[in-house]
Amino acid sequence: GRRGSTASTELSVAWNLQNRPEFHRRVFSAGLKYRWPTRDGRVQYKLDVLDLSYVYMPWISATFKHDYLDSVSNRNAILRYNYEDLFIMKAGFGLTYNAGDRVIRASVETAGNLLSGFSQIFRFKQNSHGQRQLFNIAYAQYAKFDFEYTRLLRFSAHNTLALHGLLGVAWPYGNSTVLPFEKRYFSGGANSVRGWSVRELGPGKYRGRDGRIDFINQTGDMRLDLNLEYRTHLFWKFDGAAFVDAGNIWTLRSYPEQPGGQFQLDTFFKQIAVSYGLGLRLNFGYFILRLDGAMKAINPAYDDHKDHYPIFHPRWGRDFAFHFAVGMPF
């Protein structure tokens, strides 16, 4: 355009299928986005004008339904909420500042406020949990904020220290007491605290107890990541890395099914998980293959000194995690 920068409008339609042994989940979404850069190209803005998602469950296994959703002794609110059909109508704004050795990303999104207004005017019906419904489907209401900072300190052509911090907070309110599964934070994995496998860490000092539902119990409303990574060129296309990662996720409300998971100002720093490791990267320029191996150093899921500090008492089978990924972690 005239400014020497190009704005773009994106119309997207997506269909997501998730088939697990316990359930089938479908997400249909459509969105209108508008992106534009500043004249120098350093800042890219993104406006989510409108984004609609419809989440529905065509099938849930009878035993799973009986054991977790209908059982009076195990009325898991987080599970139950995430196994009901849901409508998400959101809008958002984000920006990315990229100065080469310094990258900042920030975004905010809100959902359900417009529908909440309509529900007051048109008196939408309520379901058994007191949630207002549109076409017999409850709608989600939340606000979400994400901030990410990466700094590269280049000592020479082949040696770089990368610093990275990430903070995400989402608050369900109004029509929602629980964040939709798609919007919940998780920790661990190739781009987080690498001493844990994906969705294996947190929230807080909560420890996963049930393989069938840990993937949803080990999610939260808040995420903190702090990473330090030294990168060096080895030979040919191979680069090496040594890193330390710290972080966790937390819930903002207290949920009985996630004991020890709530964020509290006076205890959260004791629940920060730490891991350390080495990485090997095969760098082809246009894409990077990455192998990272990490050991747990501080594990908030255990109170006992020996298990809480695996850096002093490492157990290979319990404390090691291996990741294969495409692209850099940050």
Report each predicted region and the residues it spans:
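Extracellular loop and loop/strand-boundary signature of outer-membrane beta-barrel proteins
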Residues: 16-18, 76-82, 130-136, 211-216, ...
